[in-house]
Structure formats: C-alpha cells, structure tokens
C-alpha cells in the first residue's frame, strides 16, 4: 500500500532536479538556472557571448546586407550533435548577444543560405567576430 501511495505521488513532484528541460529559472532547483538551450545548469557554467559581424570591413546596414538580409546563428561544443541556434537573425543588427549560454558551447556558426557558412571560436572575453565577404 505504501508503494502504491509513493507511486501516486511521484508524478506530482516537480521536474527541477537538474539537467532537465526548462523554460524559466523557476523550473530548475538547487540554485540552478535555465540556460538558453533550455537545460537546468549551475550559473557558473554559463556566460554571455556577443557575436559581431561586418561585411567587407563595413558596418552592417541596408546597403551591405542587401544580398543577405537574414542569417542563422548556431552554437556548438566539442560534440557536434550538441548544438542549438536561432534564425532568422537580421544582418542589419551587426551583432547578436546571448546570455546564459552554457560554457561548453565554445564555437559560433554564422551563415546565410547560399552565401556563406563560417565558424569562429568564442574568445576569453566572450566574443566571436566575423568579417563577411560581400
């Protein structure tokens, strides 16, 4: 009977036991936060990363971005299967900032279908910079 009562209670327990799926910090427990890849992780295992780009050495604007108005951005770690990203990312922004990125993601891929696909390492200051060819 006790086993049955325990089994009935288990589904009511919150998922926040660490390394689980989350949508916000309150979905996590034990001082963990919800990283941008939707996993619970210790705050010290995350960082902010800023990706910037220019086109032929020029600032991103309506003229320099005319042939490629939107990009995709992906973040990778040592395991190529461990990745996630965002699209569309407007070229004219000239930058993309992400906070609460797990530190295991140490590479940024910036691409535009039919134009380019480049990868850079995130440097010690949390930056990845690209100069794209027009």
What are the language-model segments listed below?
Residues 14-17:
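Bacterial signal peptide processing site
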Residues 57-82:
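Short, ordered, surface-exposed loop/turn motifs in non-cytosolic proteins
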Residues 89-90, 111-134:
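Structured interaction patches on ligand/partner-binding surfaces of diverse proteins
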Residues 10-12:
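C-terminal motif of bacterial Sec signal peptides marking the signal peptidase cleavage site
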Residues 42-61, 133-134:
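A short, Gly/Thr-enriched small/hydrophobic beta-strand-prone motif that recurs across taxa
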Residues 21-33:
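Disulfide-braced loops of extracellular cysteine-rich modules
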Residues 94-98, 102-114:
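A short, solvent-exposed beta-strand micro-motif common in secreted/extracellular proteins
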Residues 32-43:
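Short, disulfide-bonded extracellular cysteine-rich repeat modules
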């Amino acid at each position: 009977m006790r086993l049955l009562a325990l089994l009935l209670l288990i589904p009511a327990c919150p998922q926040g036991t660490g390394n689980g799926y989350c949508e916000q910090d309150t979905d996590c427990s034990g001082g963990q936060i919800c990283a941008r890849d939707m996993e619970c992780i210790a705050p010290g295992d995350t960082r902010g990363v800023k990706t910037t780009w220019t086109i032929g050495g020029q600032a991103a604007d309506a003229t320099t971005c005319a042939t490629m108005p939107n990009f995709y951005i992906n973040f990778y770690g040592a395991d190529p299967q461990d990745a996630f990203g965002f699209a569309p990312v407007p070229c004219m922004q000239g930058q993309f900032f992400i906070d609460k990125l797990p530190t295991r993601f140490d590479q940024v891929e910036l691409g535009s279908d039919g134009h380019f696909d480049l990868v850079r390492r995130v440097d010690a200051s949390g930056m990845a910079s690209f100069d794209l060819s027009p």
